[in-house]
A protein has these predicted regions:
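Bacterial N-terminal signal peptides
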Residues: 1-8
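Boundary at the C-terminal end of the N-terminal hydrophobic targeting segment
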Residues: 8, 13-15
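Regulatory alphaC helix of protein kinase catalytic domains
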Residues: 16-25
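A small-residue-enriched
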Residues: 26-94, 115, 206, 233-305, ...
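Amphipathic alpha-helical coiled-coil segments
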Residues: 37-52, 119-144, 153, 160, ...
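Short, charged, amphipathic alpha-helical segments
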Residues: 103-106, 169-177, 375-383
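Periplasmic alpha-helical coiled-coil/stalk elements that build and connect Gram-negative outer-membrane
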Residues: 116-235, 335-338, 342, 385, ...
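Metallo-beta-lactamase
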Residues: 189, 241, 395
Length: 416
């Protein structure tokens, strides 16, 4: 009975053209403002790569000299000896400073992209949990409606037995009074479904779609097989974005250390200028050229502190990556245990308990209708069947949630 209801739930959702998980996921990643803001941060880091690779601008200097400011030997010709010197200078960066700056910026962008993917990974877990809760609420509502339909048939049979003198009025009254429990369950299921839809719409940042027009559809079942734990561990080592960010941080730290060493080297400034009517020892040197090389003497400042800091940062990044690796294994192991435990609980329900509860309910109902069982036995059988149904649905919901947790721990969808 339960598998039929689960399938009917999926068919009902499809008739309402509900959103599938892939559609919900795509809509979330497209519209979520938190993800969009974080992606803008990655785009900013990408733009900083341009700045990091820029060459130093050449410098232009225009200087004037040789203007007489006071008479000499009663001669004052202030502008006769004036000359103007246009100068071009350029700082030449040595030891691949520019290339190392670009490499560090590119590695920073890759770290930012990995962190963005990690944010997406964590937020998708919350979205998937809300999606599963909505599916579960829909299944519970369908089960409650099916139980009420079945119980209404029992009430009709009881009234026929009353008219035939085969059942007392007090027993019929007790049966009809218990119908209120089914009505309460339906109303509670309706409220839970609506609440789950509202929470899912909130995560989607959708305040325009009416709740009544929003629905989801998907497979609400479990898979009885699970790959070995080592397979999931290996996938996580390759796919977890936070671990990839930690490993890329090591690379950036090493690049920054190379850059610190490079920044400790000397960068000469090369200058050249032209002079007309210059004051020099050559009386015929009206048009002259000059050049200079300015070399800082790195006697005291050789960037020692930054070299030491970046060396320490390499060790820190390596330790952080080991901690991230340990966290990955812990997350995968914990989630794997939850999934495996839920599968172990679900298998006997699917193989035995569901059919057994249905068989007991139908057998006791038949016996009660023919005087072979008491009213209390009949009502207990109805209650036991509903409890088994609900427990099975709740276990499937727990399985799907733990599967989402395993997907998050691994870093990609390994269980649909």
């Amino acid at each position: 009975m339960v598998p039929v209801l689960l399938y009917a739930c999926g068919s009902h959702a499809e008739a309402q053209t509900g959103y599938t998980w892939d559609q919900i996921k795509a809509k979330f990643e497209t519209d979520n403002p938190t993800l969009k803001a974080d992606q803008s941060n990655v785009d900013e880091m990408k733009a900083e790569e341009i700045t990091a690779y820029l060459r130093p601008n050449p410098q232009f200097t225009l200087s004037q000299d040789g203007t007489q400011i006071a008479p000499h030997n009663n001669v004052w010709q202030p502008l006769r000896g004036t000359y103007v010197v246009p100068t071009i200078s350029y700082l030449h960066e040595r030891e691949h400073k520019r290339e190392l700056r670009l490499e560090s910026a590119q590695e920073g962008t890759r770290i930012g992209q990995a962190q963005h993917q990690d944010l997406d990974r964590n937020m998708l877990f919350g979205l998937r949990t809300a999606f599963v809760a909505t599916l579960q609420a829909r299944v519970v509502l369908d089960l409650a409606k099916a139980d009420l339909d079945y119980y209404d048939k029992i009430i009709d049979i009881s009234r026929n037995r009353l008219r035939a003198g085969d059942l007392a009025q007090i027993d019929v009254d007790r049966i009809e009074l218990l119908r209120v429990q089914y009505e309460v369950e339906i109303q509670s299921a309706i409220v839970n479904l609506r609440t789950a839809k509202i929470q899912l719409l909130q995560l989607l940042d959708d305040n325009k779609t009416p709740v009544e027009q929003f629905d989801v559809t998907g497979r609400f079942d479990f898979t009885g097989t699970l790959r070995p734990l080592d397979d999931f561990r290996q996938i996580a080592l390759n796919a977890r974005p936070d671990l990839q960010a930690a490993l890329q941080t090591i690379q950036q730290s090493e690049t920054n250390h190379k850059l610190a060493i490079s920044n400790g080297s000397t960068d000469p400034t090369i200058s050249g200028w032209y002079t007309y009517n210059s004051s020099n020892n050559n009386p015929n040197g009206l048009d002259t050229l000059g050049a200079s090389v300015n070399i800082p003497l790195r006697i005291f400042d050789r960037n020692q502190g930054e070299k030491q800091r970046t060396q320490i940062d390499i060790a820190r990044s390596q330790q952080a990556s080991e901690a991230a690796r340990a966290q990955v294994f812990s997350d995968v192991d914990t989630a794997y245990t939850l999934v495996d435990s839920n599968i172990a609980l679900l298998k006997p329900y699917k193989d035995k308990y569901n059919d057994q509860a249905l068989r007991v309910r139908d057998t006791v109902t038949y016996a009660w209708q023919h005087g072979g069982a008491s009213l209390m036995d009949f009502l207990n059988a109805q209650s036991d069947y509903r409890q088994v149904q609900l427990a099975y649905v709740q276990l499937i919901g727990a399985y799907l949630t733990s599967a989402a947790q395993l997907n998050m721990a691994v870093g990609q969808e390994v269980i649909q």
